[in-house]
Amino acid sequence: ELWYTGNYKDPETGEREATQCVVTSTDMEHFKKQVPPVIARQPEGYTAHFRDPQVWRDVDGSYRMLLGVQRENLTGAALLYRSSDLRTWECEGEMTFPDADGAFDAFGYMWECPNLVRLVDEETGEARDVLIICPQGISPEREGFENVFPCIAIVGELVGTELRGADGSFEEVDRGTEFYAPQVMARSASSDPGAPTLLFGWAGNAGEDDQPSIETGGWVHCFTAPRALTLRGG
């Protein structure tokens, strides 16, 4: 199954609609679209910037979906949904950060491409949940966050909808100017415990006019090489 966001923008009014969709395939050549979309619109309190689903199976056997959203007050967040059959979804609410002292309450104007991955800290041996997001609207600093839109990692432990232990600190996933929108791929620990957790991203960003690669190399947008993820020291 391939999960994606269906985006429609009215050419006359400019109004946007976003739906969460799935297609299925047995051979990765022929695809069948699930109609209607599994999530037809965003919940109350959010704009139509509602996209980028990540779906995984939880330890209790149910399925969860993580989405990037924009609140009506024009701040970014991540929403969690739950399902028993991958077709009917119930919104659980926003991912919250009870130990971050409000650091992520108004953190950029949109969170794109959220991914949640569990990694074992190589220094402590503890399993940790790592939230990877691309928060639009973060100001560049003297050193770092100089990408058009940065990609960051927040470390904690997901309990329900709370990412506990995340204290407000975060790290850039990549410090270059041509990295965005990564997707994480991992085998289940039970099926292949030694398999690496891989990350692919865009080598490029949203607008052609802002890309250094246009003038220097005559290209824009491609995938990065795969990267194996590790966590050391939280």
Residues covered by each model-derived region:
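Beta-propeller and closely related beta-sheet repeat lectin domains
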Residues: 48-54, 112-115, 180-183
